[in-house]
Amino acid sequence: MNCIIFFYKFYDIEVWDLPKVNDKIIQKPAPIYFKEMPDKKVIREAFQIASPLMKAIILFSCSSGCARTETLSLTIGDYIKALSEYLPNNRRDIFDVIDYLNDVDDVVSTFSILRKKTNKYYLTYCSPEAVKSINAYLLLRDRPITDESPLFQISRTYMVQSFEMINDTLGLGRVGRYRRFRSHMLRKFHASALYNDCMSIDKVNDLQGKAKNKTDAAYFMTNPDDLKYEYIQHLPAVTINTDVEKLSVKSPQFIQMEKENEVLKSEVGDMRNELEEMRGLKKELLGIINKVSEGS
């Protein structure tokens, strides 16, 4: 503000004194307490009455912590890229991707997202149940889908209205001026659930794309592999419908090794069958030779 006033005065533009602001009469937003946030029970109830699209958004928001703006900016291409470490190089069509991952239950997708608020990219992840829900929703889409198509086909206004409808149907009421069940509350759920599951606040901030100060941003860089490993350790905290206490989330490399091992086992089995056939033919041939020798 001082810079603006200095600019005007420098060019001899008269600036009237502004009235002083009385902090006592400013309407401040009501504080949000932990007990007022939706817990897993509430989120499960919301999930049960939601449309397939909103089911996908709810699970994605809870497990990724993405803000509404970033959620709506994601494309099909972004989603395929987030799944790429689990896919062969030639899988680029979204329906091929969904078919390929149909029987894989431990996919933790990695999103590189540009946060509009800070204009910086950050990494976050979403849970296997969110991936399943997104895939189920995409299979119901009736419009042609390209890499540039939005991942969630919904406008900002309709998304807000959908959250409001769920909130009012469940009778969840309001927290201050806002309804209790809304997208920003799911972002708060994500942060609080991870923090209360003993994830460090720095890691939580990294997953939510919150800005570091310039010095920290320049000198302290998060290792993506370590961040994903840390996220997987706390995955049960942000998983809503699935019991993941005993879920073994395997690395893509290990999954690939398992698949290659299955192929090798199949090939070895085929080779053994061929050897058995050759042994049988050899015995038959020796029998014929012996009979011919005895006859002569």
Predicted regions and their residues:
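C-terminal catalytic core of Y-nucleophile DNA break-rejoin enzymes
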Residues: 116-136, 146-167
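Conserved tyrosine-mediated DNA breakage-rejoining catalytic core shared by Y-recombinases
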Residues: 74-133
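Flexible interdomain linker/hinge and immediately adjacent N-terminus
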Residues: 13-45, 117
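Basic, Lys/Arg- and aromatic-enriched nucleic-acid-binding interface segment
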Residues: 40-72, 187
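Heptad-repeat coiled-coil/leucine-zipper oligomerization helices
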Residues: 253, 260, 267, 274-277, ...
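Non-catalytic DNA-binding core/recognition domains of DNA-processing enzymes
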Residues: 1-13, 126
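Catalytic-site neighborhood detector that most strongly recognizes the C-terminal catalytic loop/helix
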Residues: 208-259
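Short, basic (Lys/Arg/His-rich) helix/loop patches that form interaction surfaces
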Residues: 142-149, 161-206, 210-213
